[in-house]
């Protein structure tokens, strides 16, 4: 049955996105079988719950296609590891430390503005947010290390700081260190140069929580990886929390040593995906309130509907509008936003049409536009049709009746139902959300 599971994984890899497969399916291991039950093992409760909720029917279908319809699946949780990393010999330890990193008399390098209260949680980052909160509430508990990955400007750095700030709010004496991997490497180089490796070791290995941002930058740097490896081992053995972020899944970081890659996979791996329009609006609202900027609803939607998924860029647009409003004494309006941000945002509502969306979606699903306009209720047509209708409402100024007219004369209530159906699925179905995001980006590019 192990061969069946490996083949089922291979089949699932062909239909799921690379990121989804790596996050949810690849970590599932074969345990054994009894009668017609396939026993599988999830690395932790988080993964088990999410797979059971979103992917178990798909997994079961894949397995049954290779066996028979009577095969069942039992998804268990891996037992906690009792093995700990081997303590490196004194001759191997070459870590260094110039100044202490935390405690009442030293800087943690944390940004006090980045807290869980200021983090906007949506479907795209809910898992990573929950994982970060769990670590902050119980450091070195179930999820050690915690590895958070995702694209630029999606909130990884915010969550790292939020973990540190929360722990400090509970325990001011906690020794916490937030470093970028580049700063870690530069400090290592300086300590090697001035022969202060003992200080380097004492600094990082006495931490209660080590937070490293953008770990991918140490890939290919042999000495830095070696020092981080020993630091990781020392902290892990001392039951201290380690949290790192990256723009890629551990296995996808070129030049990263296998021993580090395997250690990152000991704990929990959580991804952050691009925010949807609703989450971007919520982010803008929170930022506007914090900066005392009066932001009309139509302007918030205009900014959120831009092609950028980078939260920092999104907030930068808001700050720019706020500055213009403050300096000119004028209220922010949609016309002002279009004028001030014309070099950044192309107003998609002026360029994208219902016909363009229909053609683009039909090509993506290998369908004909006529299929999307038809009344056929085949599942292979219903979902693409609903997605196309949702995108028409999202990316054009067309009203519900106008969209219905272009989809074969459908009633506006049918169009409203399709939009609401997709909106609901976006928060529940990772694959559908990825598909919608891919289509949206393609239409805006």
From Swiss-Prot:
Region span, Disordered: 83-106
Spans annotated as Domain II: 71-108
A matching Pfam family: Bac_DnaA_C
Domain of life where this protein originates: Bacteria
Span list, region Domain IV, binds dsDNA: 326-445
Family: Belongs to the DnaA family.
A molecular function GO annotation: ATP hydrolysis activity
Principal place of residence: cytoplasm
Region (Domain I, interacts with DnaA modulators): 1-71
Gene: dnaA
Chain segments carrying region Domain III, AAA+ region: 109-325
One of the GO biological process terms: regulation of DNA replication
Keyword entries, A-Z: ATP-binding, Cytoplasm, DNA replication, DNA-binding, Lipid-binding, Nucleotide-binding
Subunit (UniProt): Oligomerizes as a right-handed, spiral filament on DNA at oriC.
A Gene Ontology term for the protein's cellular component: plasma membrane
Signal peptide: none
Binding site for ATP: 153, 155-157
Function of the protein: Plays an essential role in the initiation and regulation of chromosomal replication. ATP-DnaA binds to the origin of replication (oriC) to initiate formation of the DNA replication initiation complex once per cell cycle. Binds the DnaA box (a 9 base pair repeat at the origin) and separates the double-stranded (ds)DNA. Forms a right-handed helical filament on oriC DNA; dsDNA binds to the exterior of the filament while single-stranded (ss)DNA is stabiized in the filament's interior.
Location(s), subcellular: Cytoplasm
Record-given protein name: Chromosomal replication initiator protein DnaA
Biological source species: Geobacter sulfurreducens (strain ATCC 51573 / DSM 12127 / PCA)
InterPro entries xref list: AAA+_ATPase, Chromosome_initiator_DnaA, Chromosome_initiator_DnaA-like, Chromosome_initiator_DnaA_CS, DnaA_C, DnaA_dom, DnaA_N_dom, DnaA_N_sf
Domain notes: Domain I is involved in oligomerization and binding regulators, domain II is flexibile and of varying length in different bacteria, domain III forms the AAA+ region, while domain IV binds dsDNA.
